[in-house]
Amino acid sequence: MDQEESHVISIFETLGAYFINIFYNFLYKNALYKKHSIVTEYQYQVKGYILGVKQNKKLYEKMLDSFYKYFCNITQINSKTLNFSNFITTIVDSFIPKEYSQSISLEKKESILELLLCDYISNLGTFITTEKMLPFIIKNRKENYHKVTKEMQDYSLTFLLKKRMELYNKFLRKQAYVEPETELEETYARLSSYNRSLLHQIEELTSEKKSLLADLSTLRKKYEKRQSEYRRLVQLLYQQIQRSSTSKSSYPLTKFIETLPSEHFSNEEYQKETPADQKEVVEMELLRKQELLTSQELTSKSPNNYPVPHSRTIVSKPPDNYPVPRSRTTTKLDFDNSLQNQELHTKNGFSEKDIVEFGQDKPEEENILAIDQDKPEEENILAIKQDIPEEENILAIDQDKPEFNQDTPEFKEAVLDTKENILEEENQDEPIVQNPFLENFWKPEQKTFNQSGLFEESSNFSNDWSGGDVTLNFS
């Protein structure tokens, strides 16, 4: 160790001895006069001293003046020989290189010394109040005096030497830095420094990007695995619906399949497993079941569970004084048509026997009531006035009796004889009035109910009278 370093170490040890005495003795005595516990109060005293030196300028100046007197007393240097400004220069020169000592002003040295002392006091106070040192300072002080003070001096000297090395490096870096001579060089140096910082940020972001890409790749593999499993389950579910398409429980599953995205049914494997014809058959079956369920719901909501008619056809009241039929059944309608034909043929010179024989020669005209049965608007002709109880099941009367079979000639002749008797009884009470409308052959006017309950006019059969031979056309 050379003479210069020994001089610096002696100054650092003197500095450490002064502040160790303050922390170990002075602050401990102040803690004894307080009402709180010694440990808690000692911690308050250390913290208050550190904050006071940093924030209170007068306390700092008082502390520095006290240290100046202590330094002169320990080094045995006369205060007249070592004034206060030389004292500050001596302390600061021990931390910086000699070549920079003369270039630094006294004010700059004072600010450097203030920063050094504040930093040193803060670190020394933190070290003393640790769990390792605090019990030895508060308890058994006489027994632990040499041990505690030795550890505090070692820490103080180590910290001051470390601080001296940091200041040396700063001054050396400043000496190595050449100030730019022109503005262009200054701008280049500034941009170069900024560029280096950007490159450092780019490296950090690149590494972060790599880690995120690795995480994304892992998540993508998991997603593809889950998607393949989901697609396979959907295909199995759809195949199960195809196998159980005749069961009633397949309808909710079909509705569930319709809500799924179509992308799950567009892969090649599914196209191979399910042919196009089979898909069409399944779709038609599903549509048919949906229509059946819809019709069942409508039927359940209608009164008395009767089907709702789509069209209701009636025969309107003929003009003049012609008798009005009270019921629109097959037997009554046949009677009305026969009565009209009888009057017309009687007027034109034909008899009932000729008409019957004429009707037998043409088998396609045997069923008079079969006119326009293929037209949907006349299929439910008996559904009018469903609220009248005597007309609800009028078609069901005596259908099982063989004597009412309308396809036999005997039934036709019996009906004609019955109608002749009824006509004679009615004519006895009321004379027949010649209706000029019958000259052109009476054609019943037909009206139909639409869904809103209004009448719609329609002419579904025409009867032509061409003179001479009798020709009956039913279209």
Curated annotation (Swiss-Prot):
Residues glycosylated per entry: N73, N83, N195, N450, N460
Bilayer topology: Single-pass membrane protein
Polar residues: bias regions: 295-305
GO cellular component, one term: host cell membrane
Keyword Transmembrane: yes
Transmembrane segments: 7-28
Inducing stimuli: Expressed in the late phase of the viral replicative cycle.
Keywords: Coiled coil, Glycoprotein, Host membrane, Late protein, Membrane, Transmembrane, Transmembrane helix
Compartment list: Host membrane
Region Disordered: start-end pairs: 295-324
Coiled coil: 183-233
Family, similarity comment: Belongs to the asfivirus B475L family.
Protein known as: Uncharacterized protein B475L
Organism classification: Viruses, Varidnaviria, Bamfordvirae, Nucleocytoviricota, Pokkesviricetes
